[in-house]
A protein has these predicted regions:
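Extracellular/periplasmic envelope-modification machinery, especially enzymes
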Residues: 1-310
Length: 310
């Protein structure tokens, strides 16, 4: 009996006590530094969740844009406004633009849709059904911005390369020459539509992808393995940059925003900035990371809303 108490009862009670204390104290958070705790918290911030209702999946395509999706400066005190649309890579930039908009005292409205380029009258998707749904969604966006008087319209996305097979006209386009011609023509037409509304277009180049690296890399490096390589290669955005470069004279007010000017040194892009992990998954920024990039973008380059109209 004595042996049973020593070998079983006492150890069991000890571990139950430790577990109970751990639960009560939320897992002994003080065992890590404040910096580590902050890194862990940043990794679990998701714009697609915080902007639920304003960012839609395919089955929510019919959701219409709405003033209910306003963010940043309160509408009543705002000195300007902007509309941001595109795919999930536009959604993950909402905290970035919210930070800049608060600084400029303007209001934003987001209307983003999974896997849909922000280009009007373009059938874009992995199949004809999805391409048609994307085109309809952008028609809804176009009607909304034409009914308003936005100062800026932000176009952001996971932009395609010349070898994309996601353009339909009406059949799937596979020729790189046709891809470039259709992409360029439809982008120009979209910018003309935006220009006619009186808004200044802002094109945002895409951010890097992790290519298999874990978004937790910088946290693992700090905790377990200082030798971990937590950097990735810059996204060249080759097709979009080539097209934009060829049409600048047509749109002298067009603003280009490239977060990689802050995130990267030449082609080398650390996965953290000022001690904050930037990503939440393979190719999306977390909310805290996006805000940190915005703060540095405003300081080192310029707030694109600096000339917001009163």
């Amino acid at each position: 009996k004595t042996a049973f108490i020593k070998m079983y009862i006492i150890p069991t009670c000890f571990f139950i006590a430790i577990a109970t204390i751990g639960i009560a104290m939320s897992g002994f958070p003080e065992r890590f530094s404040k910096e580590i705790t902050a890194q862990e918290a940043a990794l679990h911030t998701f714009a697609n969740e915080s902007r639920k209702g304003c960012h839609s999946s395919l089955r929510q395509r019919a959701v219409l844009p709405s003033d209910a999706c306003a963010f940043a400066a309160p509408i009543a005190q705002s000195q300007g406004s902007f509309f941001i649309f595109g795919d999930s890579h536009a959604n993950h930039l909402v905290p970035f633009f919210a930070t800049l908009a608060i600084e400029a005292n303007i209001t934003g409205i987001d209307y983003t849709f999974d896997r849909c380029l922000p280009i009007f009258n373009l059938a874009w998707g992995s199949n004809t059904y999805k391409a048609n749904e994307c085109q309809i969604r952008n028609n809804q966006a176009q009607k909304f911005l034409e009914s308003k008087h936005f100062d800026y319209v932000v176009l952001a996305a996971s932009w395609p390369g010349i070898t994309t097979k996601r353009i339909f006209d009406p059949q799937r386009i596979t020729s790189p020459e046709q891809v470039r011609e259709i992409f360029s023509r439809k982008l120009i037409e979209s910018l003309e539509i935006i220009k006619k509304t009186g808004a200044t277009p802002i094109i945002v180049y895409d951010t890097p992808t992790l290519k298999g690296k874990s978004p937790n890399c910088t946290l693992k490096k700090a905790l377990y393995n200082p030798a971990l390589e937590c950097s990735v290669i810059a996204n060249d955005n080759a097709l979009l940059k080539a097209v934009v470069g060829s049409i600048k004279n047509q749109f002298p007010l067009l603003i280009e925003v490239d977060l990689q000017q802050i995130m990267c040194q030449e082609n080398h892009c650390p996965m953290a900035l000022n001690g904050v992990p930037l990503f939440r998954d393979e190719d999306h920024l977390n909310e805290i990371g996006a805000k940190v990039i915005a703060e540095q973008y405003s300081k080192q380059i310029q707030n694109p809303f600096a000339k917001a109209k009163g």
